[in-house]
Swiss-Prot record:
It comes from Methanosarcina acetivorans (strain ATCC 35395 / DSM 2834 / JCM 12185 / C2A). Residues 3-202 form the Glutamine amidotransferase type-1 domain. Its main location: cytoplasm. Its EC number is 4.3.2.10, 3.5.1.2. Keywords: Amino-acid biosynthesis, Cytoplasm, Glutamine amidotransferase, Histidine biosynthesis, Hydrolase, Lyase. The gene is hisH. The active site is at residues 79, 183, 185. GO terms for biological process: L-histidine biosynthetic process. Pathway: Amino-acid biosynthesis; L-histidine biosynthesis; L-histidine from 5-phospho-alpha-D-ribose 1-diphosphate: step 5/9. It catalyses: 5-[(5-phospho-1-deoxy-D-ribulos-1-ylimino)methylamino]-1-(5-phospho-beta-D-ribosyl)imidazole-4-carboxamide + L-glutamine = D-erythro-1-(imidazol-4-yl)glycerol 3-phosphate + 5-amino-1-(5-phospho-beta-D-ribosyl)imidazole-4-carboxamide + L-glutamate + H(+); L-glutamine + H2O = L-glutamate + NH4(+). This is Imidazole glycerol phosphate synthase subunit HisH. The lineage of its organism: Archaea, Methanobacteriati, Methanobacteriota, Stenosarchaea group, Methanomicrobia.
């Protein structure tokens, strides 16, 4: 069985992601150990909370995560985990991210729409990629976020509309570093299928 490690860096919904992966037949480990991360077949970077707090907690693992990404093995960031994959965020003050995917994290502008963007919304699939194998365009998934990713079309796997069009799922140029702004572990059968697809990529 493939070894999937959920990175424990002090922030994130580790147990719900673990349960989602177990539901699709994986046996994930939760670890912040660099050796366990580097020897994994795939890693997941979950996250809830503030971007700047996440980056402070990730300082000891920044090089390890970059090395894993360079190896070509699959990596998935979820929610805040997607945001920290990017170059920078304007949350709090301008804060540098892991810079594994070019792009910025911006706050939703003031409008009649409530922020955070919370609840079910549909996504538009923009690229043919194994992460979205068998997922229908227009599928509904579950979001909870006040900031969104702004990146290129080349780095966008799926988009979502909430006052503006934003990247609901991102990918690097090699195709192995991916992110979802939505929570696949809370997105019913669609989300579980996405997690299953990730496991199959590992």
């Amino acid at each position: 069985m493939k070894r999937i490690v959920i990175i424990d860096y002090g922030l994130g919904n580790l147990r719900s992601v673990q349960k989602g992966l177990e539901h699709v037949g994986a046996n994930p480990a939760i670890s912040g150990n660099p050796e366990e991360i580097l020897t994994a077949d795939g890693i997941i970077l979950p996250g809830v909370g503030a971007f700047i707090d996440a980056m402070k907690c990730l300082i000891p693992l920044k090089g390890v995560i970059a090395e894993f990404a360079e190896s070509g093995k699959p990596m998935l960031g979820i929610c805040l985990g997607q945001q920290v994959l990017m170059s920078s965020s304007e949350e709090g003050r301008l804060t540098g991210g892991l810079d594994l995917i070019q792009g910025r994290v911006l706050r939703f502008p003031k409008s009649e729409l409530k922020v955070p963007h919370m609840g079910w919304n549909n996504i538009r699939i923009k690229q043919d990629h194994p992460l979205f194998k068998g997922i229908s365009d227009g599928s509904f998934v579950y979001f909870v976020h006040s900031y969104y990713v702004d990146t290129t079309a080349e780095n966008t796997l799926a988009s979502c509309e909430y006052g503006l069009d934003f990247s609901a799922s991102v990918v690097n140029s090699k195709g192995n570093v991916m992110g979802t702004q939505f929570h696949p572990e809370k997105s019913g059968t669609t989300g579980l299928k996405i997690l299953k697809n990730f496991v199959e990529m590992c």
